[in-house]
C-alpha cells in the first residue's frame, strides 16, 4: 500500500486510497504538473517482457476509449514493481454505497434510466474492433455524480473478446471477477463474450431493484443440476413495482 504523499514519476502525489480489490488498488492522487486530482490504479507487475507488453497493450486499448460514461485513461507507467493506470477522477458515490445507505430498492424508473445508459455504453464497447468486454460489472463499479451522470469504473479487467484480440491480453484480464455478478462461463474459466457483460448487468439491476444480492451462477447451476428450483427468485416477486416484462428481460439476461 502506498503511503500518503508518496510521489510517483516525479509527478503524481498520493492523497489516499479509494478502494482495494482482488486485482489492484485505486488511489486518489494529485497530478502536480497540471494541479489536477486523478485516480491511480495499481496492479502488480507480472514476470518478464510478455507482461510488460500485455500492460502496454491493455493501457493503449483503454486510452483509446472515448465515451461519456467512461472515465478517461490519461497515462500509464511502471514503477516499483507495480503497473499504474492514470485515470480521470470521478466524484460521487457508487451504487453499492447508495443501496446500502438507502436500505431499500431503488425506484424502477431510476434503475431503468441507469440501465439504458449502461446498455448504450456496452453497445459502444462490444461493437469496437476488437470488441471490448468489461468483465466485472457490479453496483460497486457504477458511480453516480452530483449531476446524476453514471460512470462505469474499474477497467483493469477490460479485454478484447476471445479469438479477436492479441493473445497477450487473455490471461492478464482473467485474474478476477465478483461471484455474485459473474456468469457461469467466467467462473469456470470457459471464455467470455458480450453476453457475459449482459449477465453481470442483469445481476446488478436485480440487486438494485430488490435490495437482495442475486444467487451466484455456480450455486444456481448446482441446484438446477440436482433437480431443485432455481434459487434466483423473479424480480417482481421481491419487488411488486417491477413489471413482469422487466423481470422477464432480467431472467433472460441471467439465464444459466
Where are these regions (language model features)?
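Activation-segment/catalytic-loop signature of the eukaryotic protein kinase fold
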Residues: 76
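Protein kinase catalytic-loop region centered on the HRD/HxD motif
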Residues: 119-132
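Conserved N-lobe ATP-binding subsite of Hanks-type protein kinase domains
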Residues: 25
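C-terminal lobe helix-coil module of Hanks-type protein kinase domains
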Residues: 180-256
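Conserved N-lobe loop of protein kinases adjacent to the ATP-binding glycine-rich P-loop
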Residues: 30-37
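AlphaC helix of the eukaryotic protein kinase fold
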Residues: 42-64
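Activation segment signature within eukaryotic-like protein kinase domains
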Residues: 114-115
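Conserved short submotifs of the Hanks-type protein kinase catalytic core
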Residues: 80-94, 98
Amino acid at each position: 500500500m502506498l503511503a500518503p504523499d508518496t510521489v510517483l514519476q516525479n509527478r503524481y502525489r498520493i492523497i489516499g486510497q479509494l478502494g482495494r480489490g482482488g486485482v489492484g488498488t485505486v488511489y486518489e492522487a494529485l497530478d502536480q504538473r497540471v494541479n489536477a486530482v486523478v485516480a491511480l490504479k495499481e496492479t502488480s507487475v507480472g514476470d518478464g517482457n510478455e507482461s510488460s507488453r500485455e500492460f502496454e497493450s491493455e493501457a493503449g486499448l483503454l486510452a483509446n476509449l472515448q465515451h461519456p460514461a467512461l472515465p478517461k485513461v490519461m497515462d500509464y507507467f511502471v514503477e516499483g514493481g507495480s503497473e499504474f493506470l492514470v485515470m480521470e477522477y470521478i466524484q460521487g458515490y457508487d451504487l453499492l454505497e447508495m443501496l446500502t445507505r438507502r436500505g431499500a430498492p431503488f425506484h424502477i424508473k431510476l434503475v431503468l434510466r441507469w440501465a439504458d445508459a449502461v446498455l448504450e455504453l456496452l453497445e459502444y464497447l462490444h461493437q469496437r474492433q476488437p470488441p471490448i468486454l468489461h468483465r466485472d460489472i457490479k453496483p460497486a463499479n457504477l458511480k453516480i455524480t452530483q449531476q446524476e451522470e453514471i460512470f462505469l469504473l474499474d477497467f483493469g479487467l477490460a479485454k478484447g473478446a476471445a479469438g479477436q484480440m492479441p493473445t497477450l491480453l487473455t490471461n492478464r484480464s482473467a485474474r478476477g471477477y465478483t461471484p455474485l455478478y459473474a456468469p457461469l462461463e467466467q467462473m469456470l474459466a470457459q471464455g467470455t463474450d458480450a453476453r457475459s457483460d449482459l449477465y453481470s448487468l442483469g445481476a446488478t439491476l436485480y440487486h438494485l431493484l430488490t435490495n437482495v444480492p442475486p444467487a451466484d451462477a455456480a450455486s444456481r447451476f448446482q441446484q438446477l443440476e440436482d433437480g431443485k428450483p432455481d434459487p434466483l427468485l423473479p424480480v417482481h416477486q421481491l419487488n411488486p413495482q417491477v413489471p413482469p416484462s422487466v423481470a422477464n428481460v432480467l431472467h433472460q439476461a441471467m439465464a444459466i
